[in-house]
């Protein structure tokens, strides 16, 4: 399979002298659903900015479906659809004009542009709003408008920079379903997000970037296997005795009727329950303290 | 992109630019119409009758070409500077920057938008002037040629201004503090023959003098300066401005971080 994106030794020093990227390598295969994660200021948007030529790189190389952004920029740009982190459309134009004009910038005939605009505005549930000035849309609608705009020239690589920031749960789930569907139809997707649950449920491969360096780059499954500690939160029927402890497990009483138990890799939950029964504690419910990827993320960043 | 795709992209920008200034006609088309009508009434009709002749014409006939040209210049310039700066300010210039169209396509799309507004306002002002005077265009080629070249030149200059502008003040500085004074002193209201030798020579350093006079030559058949020089000068300035715009776009200066 060919590479949708290939980044080698990418460095970025901003005009003020700040080094936002310290020579990163990144590879995304065609057809992949790829998560680019990292804390605030890690360099995710900088990387994306360089890929779509809004930010000038200091060193290194980037190619999109084999087209180098140095020698074949126009060809590379045609393959990319970009949904930026910040809203960047005209406040005074209508939803329809924004999407149709964008198609025009890519050289699509008016007829095709209007046809595509209708398709994507309907799919993203914006058809009713097509004649509305963009400033009058809600935050979630604005995000979807940027997705429709990014798709109108049918790029092979779709890059979304925090597409679900400020989007309610229901809408987020429908956006996930939509993205999964277009990925299944063949579009390679790269996504950044701070909702790790989102990355876990959507993405097959993942890179974690921290302070301008790649801290981890692997398959989601491999990464989750590395998880050697999981914390569970147990709610109990009666107030817990002060002396509560479970041999071989780290516990933490967070509330009268709430106990946190850390389970090391290979540990048995049965042992936990056996110990609790012995002490007369009845558990009414149990949940993960954090999303699994989240725990991993925190421990990875703590290491680096 | 193929030539045809570039053409579609170009037309998309031009259409968008024209729709923009038509949509906000209260800010773009109405003010020059009102201001110029006032000039016609005050300078032409009220004061003009006392001034008598200027360069062999009634004062009204003399000022009309300069006022039309002034409208073309400020409107072509303002259109590009405010539209492109607005795109930068609201960040939707990124829609264009990420697209595969060439820098020439982007530049000429915006320039043609400026030319369209310059010409439309010029036409409106010309039609209004017909309420006050008659116009017999003497040299149609010179008239059309100088208007077109001038509107292109000032659209390009407006683009440069937009790239460098950081706020809305920077957008109005040049029209208010440079274009308007230079045009006023560029022989819109008087023939430089009336000036003392020294000030006439100083006036000859003002590019607006050549533009206004070339246009007046087209309309009335008289000029204070050589019309060929005027065309040469506008041509050279246009090329320089074009070169500089392309330099800005090719390097991404102030547009890409
Ligand atoms: N134009 C700029 N000039 C100077 N420094 C910049 C500029 N843009 C970004 N930076 C810095 O570069 C670093 C990386 O920023 P970037 O926007 O890429 O982070 P991010 O990973 O997208 O963060 P977030 O999750 O908050 O969006 C930050 O420290 C930021 O302050
Ligand atoms: Mg970011």
Question: Where are the predicted features?
Answer:
Chain A
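Conserved ABC transporter NBD signature motif
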Residues: 60-71, 75-76
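Conserved catalytic motifs of ABC-family nucleotide-binding domains
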Residues: 154
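Conserved ABC ATPase signature
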Residues: 133-137
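Conserved ABC ATPase "signature" region
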Residues: 100, 104, 111-129
């Amino acid at each position: 399979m060919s590479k949708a994106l290939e980044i080698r030794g990418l460095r970025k020093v901003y005009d003020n002298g700040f080094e936002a990227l310290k020579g990163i390598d990144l590879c995304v295969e065609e057809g992949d659903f790829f998560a680019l994660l990292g804390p605030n200021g890690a360099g995710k948007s900088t990387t994306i900015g360089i890929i779509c030529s809004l930010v000038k790189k200091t060193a290194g190389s980037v190619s999109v479906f084999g087209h180098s952004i140095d020698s074949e920029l126009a060809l590379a740009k045609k393959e990319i659809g970009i949904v930026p982190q910040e809203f960047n459309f005209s406040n005074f134009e209508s939803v329809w004009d924004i999407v149709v004009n964008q198609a025009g910038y890519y050289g699509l005939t008016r007829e095709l542009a209007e046809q595509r605009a209708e398709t994507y505005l309907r799919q993203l549930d914006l058809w009713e709003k097509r004649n509305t000035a963009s400033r009058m849309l809600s935050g979630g609608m604005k995000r979807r408008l940027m997705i429709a705009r990014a798709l109108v020239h049918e790029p092979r690589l779709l890059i979304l920079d925090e597409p679900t920031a400020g989007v309610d749960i229901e809408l987020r789930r429908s956006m996930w379903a939509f993205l999964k569907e277009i990925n299944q139809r063949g579009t390679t997707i790269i996504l950044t997000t701070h909702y790790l649950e989102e990355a876990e449920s959507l993405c097959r491969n993942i890179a974690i970037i921290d302070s301008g360096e790649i801290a981890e780059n692997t398959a989601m499954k491999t990464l989750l296997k590395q998880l050697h500690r999981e914390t569970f939160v147990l709610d109990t029927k009666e107030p817990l005795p002060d002396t509560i402890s479970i041999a071989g497990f780290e516990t933490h009483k967070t509330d009268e009727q709430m106990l946190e138990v850390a389970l090391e890799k290979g540990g048995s939950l049965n042992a936990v329950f056996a110990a609790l029964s012995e002490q007369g504690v009845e558990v009414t419910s149990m949940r993960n303290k954090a999303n699994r990827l989240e725990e991993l993320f925190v421990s990875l960043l703590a290491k680096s | 992109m193929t030539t045809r795709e570039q053409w579609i992209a170009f037309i998309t920008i031009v259409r968008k630019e024209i729709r923009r200034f038509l949509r906000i006609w209260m800010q773009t088309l109405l003010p020059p119409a009102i201001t110029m009508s006032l000039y016609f009434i005050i300078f032409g009709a009220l004061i003009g009758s006392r001034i008598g002749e200027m360069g062999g014409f009634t004062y009204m006939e003399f000022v009309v070409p300069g006022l039309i040209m002034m409208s073309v210049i400020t409107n072509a310039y303002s259109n590009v500077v405010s539209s492109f700066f607005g795109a930068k300010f609201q960040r939707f210039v990124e829609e264009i920057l990420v697209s595969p169209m060439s820098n020439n396509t982007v530049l000429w799309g915006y320039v043609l938008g400026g030319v369209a507004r310059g010409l439309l306002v010029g036409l409106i002002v010309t039609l209004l002037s017909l309420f006050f005077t008659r116009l017999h265009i003497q040299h149609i080629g010179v008239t059309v040629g100088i208007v077109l070249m001038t509107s292109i030149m000032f659209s390009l200059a407006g683009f440069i201004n937009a790239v460098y502008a950081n706020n809305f003040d920077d957008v109005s500085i040049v029209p208010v503090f440079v274009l308007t004074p230079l045009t006023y002193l560029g022989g819109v209201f008087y023939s430089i023959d009336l000036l003392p030798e020294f000030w006439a020579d100083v006036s000859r350093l003002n590019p607006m003098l050549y533009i206004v006079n070339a246009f007046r030559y087209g309309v009335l058949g008289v000029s204070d300066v050589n019309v060929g020089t005027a065309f040469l000068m506008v041509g050279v300035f246009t090329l320089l401005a074009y070169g500089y715009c392309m330099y800005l776009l090719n390097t991404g200066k102030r547009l890409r971080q």
